[in-house]
């Protein structure tokens, strides 16, 4: 449990910055979107308030309940919200829930460190709810206030009376279905987020309950070892090479915790947090950690003779191959600085120095005390350098590919290039098989669409060394075509295309190729996914036709639900064709349904939850059979006849994001310019 911080949390510590009028008009500005991601963000905002209390040492239990009517209740055992009158003349509770940017985290009064970095939590949740109720127990007295119709108080704060209940705040709300495209909460998404919070709040118990089914479902997340258990969780389905290592310390008001462990994989997985909020773009704290680790390893390598005087130092990425690490720091509000509006990157200069010192001091001793293990890790890093140099060579060759014989022979007869050389407009279609590749070549828009048929087998890059990956002809061709290098040498500025679109058959083989390609992009060209440049084409499953000649009617359907609507529209006498492969479509049909920017449907692949994405790749593509078997049993329904690809789901089914997915995706109907519909690529139910 966190050490108590002696800051007052009372009515005077609540500051008011501005009103709440704009939230319902422009909800996306406050919660990101009005799809499933935005819906779940409401829960995180209220949970973050409870986390702030726990961070400050008040309360060690948080309960989150999805109730039968799909409302959410978040209850904590903190001090209870202030219940007196605010300086503005209305109850403080009302200020917290009806005024934007009202909270105890803006001044130095309520919290020393705060997790709710945007600080708009309670009021925004209230504004976007049909109703919200807050129950407060403070100093032996219970209070309650209700809000309806987007945050309007029903009466005022009511004093219910004396109680023996413990202090705390309970917030229950029902999201407004006129604002959100879905109001169905995903148990899995909430579980993943709450598990992460519990790992970071050592000793705090977080309980998630789902009352919607016939039998209530409940999970308790409680980790006495904190981020040490988080790292073990990240590596749960991998073969590990070391125990979990843990360092902690504090300097100049900044608290530092680092846990890490090596596995036998070839990629690094570093998750960093500031005040319990994920910094997905890293920042000064992450730089400090990486710098100090690299320095400690190189100094030790020279001390034991694994690096000679004439040898160059190993690079940080060499030491981080197979590393799973969690860095969590607590920074006082007065030192907190972020780069950019998303607050995904820490900018506090002092954080780098503090993390560097704390980690550097302890790591030097640790390497000496664990000499045998340390030397084996350095030998591993030397092998990683060899792979990195091979990757750099591949990148250099891909940059000069058109001038080099190797590049020309690799691409000859495979790539059908676009006429334009504008990387901001060009699209690359990775197409399964020659027959579909032929139709795509004929049907494409030559100006900006390039076609690369995949003829041979794509290697499973999760299990392979870099040298073996670079020997795979299909992978090598993609590297040359994309033109931005691979692995640590990848540079998105050199990418030849704005969109890289995977186009496969709607069957098991097609789905497998999608997974293999996404695994490669995730492991070795991750910036492509982070920049939103990787897509999956969604060809139709059905063609419904009627009549011939000029009077003929042709309609397409992407799901069984759409098929029923199309059949009603076409009427009696229709002919039904079920597409089993892209090759069954002629060039015109392929263009019209799958390649024309005016009419096609694309799925943009996205990573929302880095820890979950890492585990999902390992589960589906790694060496261990048992985790994969269990996941398939839980998520794949087997039928006597194949119903199509894993993407063959109705929009209603696919609106939920990433609780159990490897990577997330957004479905974009480009012609309509509507809000993106979010789906999970491997979230199969």
Curated annotation (Swiss-Prot):
What protein name applies here?
DNA topoisomerase 4 subunit B
> A Pfam family for this UniProt protein?
DNA_gyraseB
In the record, biological process GO terms are: chromosome segregation; DNA topological change
A single Gene Ontology MF term assigned here is:
ATP binding
Cofactor or coenzyme needed: Mg(2+); Mn(2+); Ca(2+)
- Describe activation and inhibition of this protein: Pyrrolopyrimidines inhibit both GyrB and its paralog in topoisomerase IV (parE).
- SUBUNIT field: Heterotetramer composed of ParC and ParE.
Lineage of the species this protein comes from: Bacteria, Bacillati, Bacillota, Bacilli, Lactobacillales
Species name for this entry?
Answer: Enterococcus faecalis (strain ATCC 700802 / V583)
InterPro entries attached here?
A: DNA_gyrase_B_C, HATPase_C_sf, ParE_type2, Ribosomal_Su5_D2-typ_SF, Ribsml_uS5_D2-typ_fold_subgr, Topo_IIA, Topo_IIA-like_dom_sf, Topo_IIA_B
**Residue positions binding Mg(2+) 2:** 505, 507
The record's SMART domains line, in alphabetical order, gives: HATPase_c, TOP2c
What role does it play? Topoisomerase IV is essential for chromosome segregation. It relaxes supercoiled DNA. Performs the decatenation events required during the replication of a circular DNA molecule.
Cofactor notes: Binds two Mg(2+) per subunit. The magnesium ions form salt bridges with both the protein and the DNA. Can also accept other divalent metal cations, such as Mn(2+) or Ca(2+).
EC number(s) in its UniProt entry?
5.6.2.2
Q: Which UniProt keywords apply?
A: DNA-binding, Isomerase, Magnesium, Metal-binding
What is the catalytic activity of this protein? Answer: ATP-dependent breakage, passage and rejoining of double-stranded DNA
GO (cellular component) term, any one? chromosome
Which portions of the sequence form the region Disordered? 389-427, 644-685
């Amino acid at each position: 449990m966190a050490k108590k911080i002696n800051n007052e949390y009372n009515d005077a510590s609540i500051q008011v910055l501005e009103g709440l009028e704009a939230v319902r008009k422009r909800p996306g500005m406050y919660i990101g979107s009005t799809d499933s991601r935005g819906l779940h963000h409401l829960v995180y905002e209220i949970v973050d308030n409870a986390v702030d209390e726990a961070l400050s040492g008040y309360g060690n239990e948080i309960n989150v309940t999805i109730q039968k009517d799909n409302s959410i209740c978040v209850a904590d055992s903190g001090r209870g919200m202030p219940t007196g009158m605010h300086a503005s003349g209305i109850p403080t509770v009302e200020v917290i829930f009806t005024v934007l940017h009202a909270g105890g985290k803006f001044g130095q009064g309520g919290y020393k460190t705060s997790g709710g970095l945007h600080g708009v939590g309670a009021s925004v949740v209230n504004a976007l709810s049909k109703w919200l109720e807050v129950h407060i127990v403070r100093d032996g007295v219970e209070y309650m206030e209700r809000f309806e119709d987007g945050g309007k108080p029903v009466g005022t704060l009511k004093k219910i009376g004396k109680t023996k209940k413990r202090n705390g705040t309970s917030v229950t709300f029902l999201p407004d279905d006129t604002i959100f495209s879905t109001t169905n909460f995903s148990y899995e998404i909430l579980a993943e987020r709450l598990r992460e919070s519990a790992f970071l709040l050592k000793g705090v118990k977080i309980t998630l309950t789902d009352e919607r089914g016939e039998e209530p479902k409940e999970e308790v997340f409680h980790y006495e070892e904190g981020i040490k258990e988080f790292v073990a969780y990240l590596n749960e389905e991998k073969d590990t090479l070391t125990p979990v290592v843990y360092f902690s310390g504090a300097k100049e008001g900044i608290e530092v915790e680092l846990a890490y462990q090596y596995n036998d994989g070839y990629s690094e997985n570093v998750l960093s947090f500031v005040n319990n909020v994920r910094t997905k773009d890293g920042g000064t704290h992450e730089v400090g950690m990486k710098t100090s680790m690299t320095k400690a390893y190189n100094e030790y390598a020279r001390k034991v003779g694994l690096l000679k005087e004439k040898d160059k130092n190993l690079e940080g990425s060499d030491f981080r191959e197979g590393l799973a690490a969690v860095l969590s720091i607590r920074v006082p509000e007065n030192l907190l600085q972020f780069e950019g509006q998303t607050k995904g990157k820490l900018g506090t200069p002092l954080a780098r120095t503090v993390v560097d010192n704390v980690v550097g001091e302890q790591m030097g001793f640790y390497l000496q005390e664990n000499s045998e293990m340390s030397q084996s890790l350095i030998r591993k890093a030397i092998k990683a350098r060899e792979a990195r140099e091979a990757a750099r060579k591949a990148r250099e060759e891909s940059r000069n590919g058109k001038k080099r014989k190797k590049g020309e022979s690799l691409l000859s007869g495979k790539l059908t290039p676009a006429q334009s050389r504008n990387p901001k407009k060009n699209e690359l279609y990775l197409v399964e098989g020659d027959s579909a590749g032929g139709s795509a070549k004929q049907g494409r828009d030559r100006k900006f669409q390039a076609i690369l048929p995949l003829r041979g087998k794509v290697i499973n890059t999760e299990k392979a060394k870099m040298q073996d990956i670079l020997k795979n002809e299909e992978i090598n061709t993609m590297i040359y075509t994309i033109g931005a290098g691979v692995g640590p040498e990848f540079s998105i500025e050199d990418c030849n295309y704005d969109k890289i679109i995977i186009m496969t058959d709607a069957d098991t083989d097609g789905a497998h190729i999608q997974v293999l390609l996404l695994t490669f992009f995730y492991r070795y060209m991750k910036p492509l996914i982070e920049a939103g440049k990787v897509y999956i084409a969604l060809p139709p499953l059905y063609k419904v036709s009627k009549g011939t000649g000029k009077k003929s009617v042709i309609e397409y359907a992407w799901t069984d639900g759409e098929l029923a609507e199309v059949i009603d529209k076409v009427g009696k006498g229709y002919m039904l064709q079920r597409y089993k492969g892209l090759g069954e479509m002629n060039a015109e049909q392929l263009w019209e349904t799958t390649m024309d920017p005016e009419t096609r449907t694309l799925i943009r692949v996205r990573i929302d939850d880095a820890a979950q994405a890492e585990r999902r790749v390992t589960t589906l593509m790694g060496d261990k059979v048992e985790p994969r078997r269990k996941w398939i049993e839980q998520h794949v329904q087997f039928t006597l006849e194949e119903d199509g690809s894993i993407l063959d789901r109705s929009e209603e089914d696919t609106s939920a994001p990433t609780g159990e997915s490897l990577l997330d995706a957004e479905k974009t109907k480009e012609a309509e310019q509507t809000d993106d519909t979010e789906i999970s690529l491997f979230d199969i139910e």
